[in-house]
A protein has these predicted regions:
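C-terminal helical subdomain
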Residues: 161, 176, 183-184, 195-234
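Conserved glycine-rich Rossmann-like NAD(P)H-binding loop of the short-chain dehydrogenase/reductase
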Residues: 23-38
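N-terminal Rossmann NAD(P)H-binding glycine-rich loop of SDR-like oxidoreductase domains
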Residues: 9-18
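Rossmann-fold cofactor-recognition segment
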Residues: 44-59
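Catalytic loop of short-chain dehydrogenase/reductase
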Residues: 83-84, 88, 92-103, 122, ...
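Conserved Rossmann-fold cofactor-binding substructure of NAD(P)-dependent oxidoreductases
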Residues: 56-71
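Hydrophobic positions on the long internal alpha-helix
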Residues: 79, 113-117, 121, 166-167
Length: 234
């Protein structure tokens, strides 16, 4: 399998690169800096082809497309993992800059990555897109008051809820083209952007996602999944 993974140099993204690579797959981790490219090349001597682009910028679409063309004719799986966290948990302290920054990465960044990988993805026999979402983007959970006030940022919850809608939009558009699109909550991960109640390492989360990708025989397109747990409500 040929796998494109955004945010591939740290946290969950790096662990996804590792687990797919360790199991014999070819990985194309997207990173923002030359330093990260060098580090990945040193870490993985073969079957790893770092892609250099900044998903916060529109030009990343062409950069992704052009670099992928140098390495491969097709991609089987796109994992949109790149993300940043918010800070403010009260509306009076929430500012437009923070909201804009998170929307830019979690939503526009996904759109840029999908556009950049589309030509290669469409050539796969079994193309898939996984958007790494979060339980915090679930309107159902929010409406049921599962998230204590003051514990989670406005901007992250809003950005992930918007990303979930984007997942469904992509699924609807790509359904007749054979491209499956799924949102995945990786678990409560202990990462730089992890929640206060995090209880799982990035490596554990990556392994759960990998096992689900490999073992799942059910079409989960248009679904919100927590690997090892089941389907979540939007």
């Amino acid at each position: 399998m040929r796998v494109f993974i955004t945010g591939g140099n740290r946290g969950l993204g790096l662990q996804l690169v590792k687990v797919f690579h360790e199991n014999g797959h070819i990985v194309y981790p997207l990173v923002r800096t030359e330093v990260a490219v060098t580090q990945l090349k040193q870490m993985f001597s073969c079957r790893c082809f770092p892609i250099l682009a900044d998903l916060s910028l529109d030009e990343s679409t062409e950069q992704i497309k052009n670099q992928l063309e140098e390495y491969t004719e097709y991609i089987d799986l796109v994992i949109n993992n790149a993300g940043i966290t918010g800070k403010e948990t009260e509306v009076l302290h929430t500012n437009s800059e923070e909201l804009t920054d998170l929307f830019n990465i979690h939503c526009l960044g996904v759109i840029r990555a999908v556009k950049g990988t589309y030509v290669a993805l469409a050539k796969s026999d079994h193309p898939r897109i996984i958007n790494v979402s979060s339980r915090l983007g679930s309107l159902h959970k929010m409406a049921n008051k599962e998230f204590p006030q003051g514990q989670f940022s406005y901007s992250y919850r809003i950005a992930k809820a918007a990303q979930n809608m984007l997942t469904l939009c992509l699924q609807q558009e790509f359904e007749n083209k054979g491209i499956r699109v799924t949102a995945i909550h990786p678990g409560k991960l202990k990462t730089d952007i992890g929640a206060f109640d995090a209880n799982m390492t990035p490596a554990e989360g990556a392994k759960n996602i990998y096992d689900w990708v490999i073992d799942s025989n059910v079409d989960a397109s248009g679904k919100f999944i927590e690997p090892g747990v089941g389907e979540l409500k939007w």
